Amino acid sequence: MAGHSQFKNIMHRKGRQDAQKSKLFSKLAREITVAAKLGTPDPAMNARLRAAMIAARAENMPKDNIERAIKKASGHDAESYDELRYEGYGPGGVAIIMEVLTDNRNRAASDIRSYFTKSGGNLGETGSVSFMFDRLGVVEYDADKASADDMLEAAVEAGADDVVSGEGGHEIYASQETFRDVARALEGKFGEARKVALIWKPQNTVAVDDNTGEKLLKLIDLLNEHDDVQNVYANFEVSDALMAKLGG
Protein backbone atom coordinates (compact mmCIF):
# COMPACT_ATOMS: atom_id res chain seq x y z
CA MET A 1 0.00 0.00 0.00
CA ALA A 2 2.76 2.44 -0.97
CA GLY A 3 1.80 6.02 -0.31
CA HIS A 4 -1.52 4.91 1.10
CA SER A 5 -1.87 7.46 3.89
CA GLN A 6 -0.78 10.28 1.60
CA PHE A 7 -3.29 9.13 -1.01
CA LYS A 8 -6.04 9.22 1.60
CA ASN A 9 -4.98 12.64 2.89
CA ILE A 10 -4.89 14.20 -0.55
CA MET A 11 -8.22 12.69 -1.57
CA HIS A 12 -9.87 13.92 1.63
CA ARG A 13 -8.60 17.50 1.45
CA LYS A 14 -11.81 18.58 -0.25
CA GLY A 15 -13.99 17.02 2.41
CA ARG A 16 -12.13 18.85 5.16
CA GLN A 17 -11.66 22.17 3.40
CA ASP A 18 -14.92 22.70 1.55
CA ALA A 19 -16.69 25.27 3.70
CA GLN A 20 -19.31 25.79 1.02
CA LYS A 21 -21.70 23.05 2.01
CA SER A 22 -24.18 24.15 -0.63
CA LYS A 23 -21.62 23.41 -3.36
CA LEU A 24 -20.87 20.03 -1.85
CA PHE A 25 -24.56 19.20 -1.50
CA SER A 26 -25.11 20.24 -5.11
CA LYS A 27 -22.49 17.76 -6.29
CA LEU A 28 -23.91 15.00 -4.13
CA ALA A 29 -27.43 15.74 -5.38
CA ARG A 30 -26.24 15.64 -8.98
CA GLU A 31 -24.77 12.15 -8.49
CA ILE A 32 -27.98 10.98 -6.78
CA THR A 33 -30.13 12.30 -9.63
CA VAL A 34 -27.94 10.74 -12.31
CA ALA A 35 -27.84 7.40 -10.48
CA ALA A 36 -31.62 7.37 -10.07
CA LYS A 37 -32.18 8.35 -13.70
CA LEU A 38 -29.88 5.64 -15.05
CA GLY A 39 -31.39 2.93 -12.87
CA THR A 40 -34.34 2.69 -10.51
CA PRO A 41 -35.22 5.17 -7.75
CA ASP A 42 -35.14 2.28 -5.27
CA PRO A 43 -31.69 2.16 -3.62
CA ALA A 44 -32.23 -1.48 -2.70
CA MET A 45 -32.24 -2.28 -6.42
CA ASN A 46 -29.77 0.38 -7.55
CA ALA A 47 -26.24 -0.03 -6.17
CA ARG A 48 -24.97 3.25 -7.57
CA LEU A 49 -27.86 5.18 -6.05
CA ARG A 50 -27.32 3.49 -2.71
CA ALA A 51 -23.63 4.44 -2.76
CA ALA A 52 -24.54 8.04 -3.62
CA MET A 53 -27.00 8.19 -0.74
CA ILE A 54 -24.41 6.79 1.67
CA ALA A 55 -21.99 9.51 0.55
CA ALA A 56 -24.66 12.16 1.07
CA ARG A 57 -25.52 10.93 4.55
CA ALA A 58 -21.83 10.85 5.46
CA GLU A 59 -21.75 14.60 4.75
CA ASN A 60 -24.92 15.19 6.80
CA MET A 61 -26.94 16.13 3.74
CA PRO A 62 -30.58 16.62 4.84
CA LYS A 63 -32.96 13.77 4.06
CA ASP A 64 -35.28 16.16 2.20
CA ASN A 65 -32.44 17.12 -0.14
CA ILE A 66 -31.72 13.47 -0.88
CA GLU A 67 -35.37 12.66 -1.60
CA ARG A 68 -35.72 15.76 -3.77
CA ALA A 69 -32.68 14.73 -5.83
CA ILE A 70 -34.19 11.27 -6.40
CA LYS A 71 -37.55 12.71 -7.46
CA LYS A 72 -35.83 15.11 -9.83
CA ALA A 73 -34.66 12.16 -11.91
CA SER A 74 -38.22 11.27 -12.91
CA GLY A 75 -39.33 14.81 -13.70
CA HIS A 76 -39.98 15.95 -17.25
CA ASP A 77 -37.56 18.82 -16.75
CA ALA A 78 -34.78 16.61 -15.40
CA GLU A 79 -31.42 17.91 -16.54
CA SER A 80 -29.25 15.66 -18.65
CA TYR A 81 -25.64 15.20 -17.59
CA ASP A 82 -22.71 13.71 -19.45
CA GLU A 83 -20.37 11.48 -17.48
CA LEU A 84 -16.81 12.21 -18.52
CA ARG A 85 -13.31 11.34 -17.43
CA TYR A 86 -10.45 13.73 -17.99
CA GLU A 87 -6.81 12.80 -17.58
CA GLY A 88 -3.64 14.81 -17.54
CA TYR A 89 -0.29 15.62 -16.03
CA GLY A 90 0.06 18.26 -13.34
CA PRO A 91 3.21 20.01 -12.09
CA GLY A 92 6.14 17.63 -11.77
CA GLY A 93 4.58 15.23 -14.28
CA VAL A 94 2.14 13.89 -11.68
CA ALA A 95 -0.76 11.89 -13.15
CA ILE A 96 -4.26 13.18 -12.41
CA ILE A 97 -7.70 11.73 -13.16
CA MET A 98 -10.92 13.74 -12.89
CA GLU A 99 -14.46 12.34 -12.94
CA VAL A 100 -16.99 14.87 -14.23
CA LEU A 101 -20.77 15.19 -14.45
CA THR A 102 -21.65 18.13 -16.68
CA ASP A 103 -24.50 19.63 -18.68
CA ASN A 104 -21.96 21.43 -20.88
CA ARG A 105 -18.95 19.37 -21.87
CA ASN A 106 -17.34 22.21 -23.83
CA ARG A 107 -17.37 24.45 -20.77
CA ALA A 108 -16.02 21.70 -18.53
CA ALA A 109 -13.19 20.84 -20.93
CA SER A 110 -12.25 24.49 -21.41
CA ASP A 111 -12.19 25.23 -17.68
CA ILE A 112 -10.20 22.13 -16.78
CA ARG A 113 -7.70 22.67 -19.59
CA SER A 114 -7.21 26.24 -18.38
CA TYR A 115 -6.53 25.06 -14.81
CA PHE A 116 -3.89 22.62 -16.02
CA THR A 117 -2.21 25.14 -18.32
CA LYS A 118 -2.02 27.81 -15.62
CA SER A 119 -0.52 25.33 -13.15
CA GLY A 120 2.21 24.25 -15.55
CA GLY A 121 0.60 20.94 -16.45
CA ASN A 122 -1.26 19.70 -19.49
CA LEU A 123 -4.55 17.93 -20.11
CA GLY A 124 -4.14 14.70 -22.06
CA GLU A 125 -6.32 12.24 -23.93
CA THR A 126 -8.53 9.69 -22.20
CA GLY A 127 -6.27 6.78 -21.30
CA SER A 128 -3.12 8.89 -21.11
CA VAL A 129 -2.65 8.30 -17.36
CA SER A 130 -5.35 5.85 -16.25
CA PHE A 131 -3.04 2.91 -16.96
CA MET A 132 -1.12 4.01 -13.86
CA PHE A 133 -4.19 3.54 -11.66
CA ASP A 134 -6.35 0.57 -10.67
CA ARG A 135 -10.12 0.84 -10.87
CA LEU A 136 -11.22 -0.55 -7.51
CA GLY A 137 -14.17 -0.55 -5.19
CA VAL A 138 -13.65 0.67 -1.64
CA VAL A 139 -15.83 0.14 1.42
CA GLU A 140 -15.02 2.14 4.55
CA TYR A 141 -16.05 1.65 8.18
CA ASP A 142 -15.25 3.61 11.31
CA ALA A 143 -12.58 2.02 13.50
CA ASP A 144 -15.03 1.21 16.30
CA LYS A 145 -17.21 -0.95 14.06
CA ALA A 146 -14.92 -3.95 14.46
CA SER A 147 -11.42 -5.00 15.43
CA ALA A 148 -8.84 -5.18 12.67
CA ASP A 149 -8.84 -8.98 12.87
CA ASP A 150 -12.62 -9.28 12.72
CA MET A 151 -12.84 -6.89 9.78
CA LEU A 152 -10.07 -8.71 7.93
CA GLU A 153 -11.74 -12.07 8.46
CA ALA A 154 -15.13 -10.81 7.31
CA ALA A 155 -13.69 -8.97 4.32
CA VAL A 156 -11.67 -11.94 3.09
CA GLU A 157 -14.69 -14.19 3.50
CA ALA A 158 -16.73 -11.70 1.46
CA GLY A 159 -14.18 -11.75 -1.36
CA ALA A 160 -12.17 -8.57 -0.72
CA ASP A 161 -8.65 -8.21 -2.10
CA ASP A 162 -7.11 -5.97 0.54
CA VAL A 163 -7.91 -4.49 3.94
CA VAL A 164 -6.19 -1.54 5.63
CA SER A 165 -7.11 -0.85 9.26
CA GLY A 166 -5.94 1.96 11.49
CA GLU A 167 -7.08 4.74 13.80
CA GLY A 168 -8.91 6.38 10.92
CA GLY A 169 -11.01 3.31 10.24
CA HIS A 170 -11.14 0.25 8.02
CA GLU A 171 -10.73 0.42 4.25
CA ILE A 172 -11.70 -2.66 2.29
CA TYR A 173 -10.69 -2.91 -1.36
CA ALA A 174 -12.19 -5.22 -3.96
CA SER A 175 -12.30 -5.53 -7.72
CA GLN A 176 -14.71 -3.46 -9.76
CA GLU A 177 -16.70 -6.61 -10.47
CA THR A 178 -17.03 -7.91 -6.91
CA PHE A 179 -17.05 -4.90 -4.60
CA ARG A 180 -20.84 -4.47 -4.57
CA ASP A 181 -21.18 -8.05 -3.29
CA VAL A 182 -18.42 -7.41 -0.76
CA ALA A 183 -20.18 -4.25 0.43
CA ARG A 184 -23.48 -6.10 0.78
CA ALA A 185 -21.89 -8.91 2.78
CA LEU A 186 -20.13 -6.50 5.13
CA GLU A 187 -23.28 -4.46 5.61
CA GLY A 188 -25.06 -7.60 6.75
CA LYS A 189 -22.40 -8.04 9.42
CA PHE A 190 -21.42 -4.49 10.45
CA GLY A 191 -24.27 -2.27 9.26
CA GLU A 192 -24.11 0.55 6.74
CA ALA A 193 -20.62 1.62 5.71
CA ARG A 194 -19.53 5.26 5.83
CA LYS A 195 -18.45 5.02 2.20
CA VAL A 196 -19.03 2.69 -0.74
CA ALA A 197 -17.49 3.84 -4.01
CA LEU A 198 -15.55 3.04 -7.14
CA ILE A 199 -12.22 4.87 -7.14
CA TRP A 200 -9.05 5.22 -9.18
CA LYS A 201 -6.22 4.11 -6.90
CA PRO A 202 -2.64 4.84 -7.99
CA GLN A 203 -0.53 1.74 -8.49
CA ASN A 204 2.47 3.68 -7.20
CA THR A 205 2.99 7.18 -5.87
CA VAL A 206 5.83 9.59 -6.54
CA ALA A 207 7.33 11.87 -3.91
CA VAL A 208 7.48 15.54 -4.87
CA ASP A 209 9.21 18.47 -3.20
CA ASP A 210 7.21 21.04 -1.25
CA ASN A 211 7.23 23.61 -4.05
CA THR A 212 5.78 21.15 -6.56
CA GLY A 213 3.47 19.71 -3.92
CA GLU A 214 2.01 23.12 -3.16
CA LYS A 215 1.30 23.72 -6.86
CA LEU A 216 -0.33 20.30 -7.15
CA LEU A 217 -2.53 20.77 -4.10
CA LYS A 218 -3.64 24.18 -5.38
CA LEU A 219 -4.54 22.61 -8.73
CA ILE A 220 -6.51 19.85 -7.02
CA ASP A 221 -8.35 22.40 -4.89
CA LEU A 222 -9.21 24.38 -8.04
CA LEU A 223 -10.54 21.25 -9.72
CA ASN A 224 -12.56 20.23 -6.67
CA GLU A 225 -14.13 23.69 -6.51
CA HIS A 226 -15.48 23.36 -10.06
CA ASP A 227 -19.19 22.56 -10.06
CA ASP A 228 -18.83 19.78 -12.63
CA VAL A 229 -15.89 17.92 -11.08
CA GLN A 230 -17.06 15.09 -8.84
CA ASN A 231 -13.79 13.36 -7.96
CA VAL A 232 -10.05 13.95 -8.40
CA TYR A 233 -7.31 11.32 -8.08
CA ALA A 234 -3.53 11.78 -8.28
CA ASN A 235 -0.42 9.66 -7.78
CA PHE A 236 1.88 11.82 -5.66
CA GLU A 237 3.12 12.13 -2.09
CA VAL A 238 3.98 15.31 -0.21
CA SER A 239 5.54 15.90 3.19
CA ASP A 240 3.36 15.80 6.29
CA ALA A 241 4.66 19.29 7.09
CA LEU A 242 3.26 20.68 3.83
CA MET A 243 -0.07 18.95 4.36
CA ALA A 244 -0.27 20.50 7.83
CA LYS A 245 0.77 23.92 6.53
CA LEU A 246 -1.96 23.90 3.88
CA GLY A 247 -4.57 22.45 6.20
CA GLY A 248 -4.54 18.99 4.63
Swiss-Prot record:
Q: Spell out the subcellular localization from the entry.
A: Cytoplasm
Predominant place of localization? cytoplasm
Q: Which family does it belong to?
A: Belongs to the TACO1 family.
Name this polypeptide is given = Probable transcriptional regulatory protein Nham_3525
State the superkingdom.
Bacteria
Q: Which residues form a coiled coil?
A: none
Q: Does the keyword Transcription apply?
A: yes
Q: Keyword set for this entry?
A: Cytoplasm, DNA-binding, Transcription, Transcription regulation
Which SUPFAM superfamilies does this one have? YebC-like (SSF75625)
Q: Which InterPro entries match?
A: Integrase-like_N, TACO1_YebC-like_2nd/3rd_dom, TACO1_YebC_N, Transcrip_reg_TACO1-like, Transcrip_reg_TACO1-like_dom3, YebC-like
Q: Which GO terms describe its biological process?
A: regulation of DNA-templated transcription
Concerning NCBIfam families, the annotation shows:
PRK00110.1 (NF001030), PRK12378.1 (NF009044), YebC/PmpR family DNA-binding transcriptional regulator (TIGR01033)
Species for this entry: Nitrobacter hamburgensis (strain DSM 10229 / NCIMB 13809 / X14)
Q: Which Gene Ontology MF annotations are present?
A: DNA binding
A GO cellular component annotation in the UniProt record: cytosol
Specify where the region named Disordered lies, as residue ranges: 1-21
Instruction: Name the residues that span the membrane.
Output: none
